[in-house]
């Protein structure tokens, strides 16, 4: 599978998860490859989807955070490369309440 198709499949997969979990019509930004923009927009969030065969280090970080947090707490990883800005990583299922709370009331 070429990388463009793999990326589009990942975007569709994330849209479907968000649609099911939030009950909100979430769609891919189809002009993003032409315009260089975000992949998905929902409320104030602009989402960039990355799908790779392996995300070895990031998954190791999350596994460590999950072990430390235990079942009663939310694991969050904050990381950065030297000279770069800090990044926050959490599981999509844990982020759903935050996204849901940010949606406009219908």
Question: Which residues does each predicted region cover?
Answer:
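Catalytic phosphate/metal-binding cores of nucleic-acid and nucleotide-processing enzymes, i.e., regions
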Residues: 1-106
């Amino acid at each position: 599978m070429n990388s463009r198709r793999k990326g589009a499949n990942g975007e569709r997969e994330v849209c479907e998860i968000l649609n099911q979990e939030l009950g909100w019509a979430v769609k891919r930004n189809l002009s993003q490859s032409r315009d260089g923009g975000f992949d998905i927009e929902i409320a104030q969030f602009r989402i960039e989807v990355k799908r790779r065969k392996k995300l070895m280090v990031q998954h190791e970080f999350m596994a460590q955070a999950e072990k430390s947090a235990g079942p009663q707490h939310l694991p969050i990883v904050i990381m950065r490369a030297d000279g770069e800005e800090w990044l926050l990583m959490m599981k999509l299922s844990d982020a759903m309440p935050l996204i849901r709370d940010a949606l406009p009331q219908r």
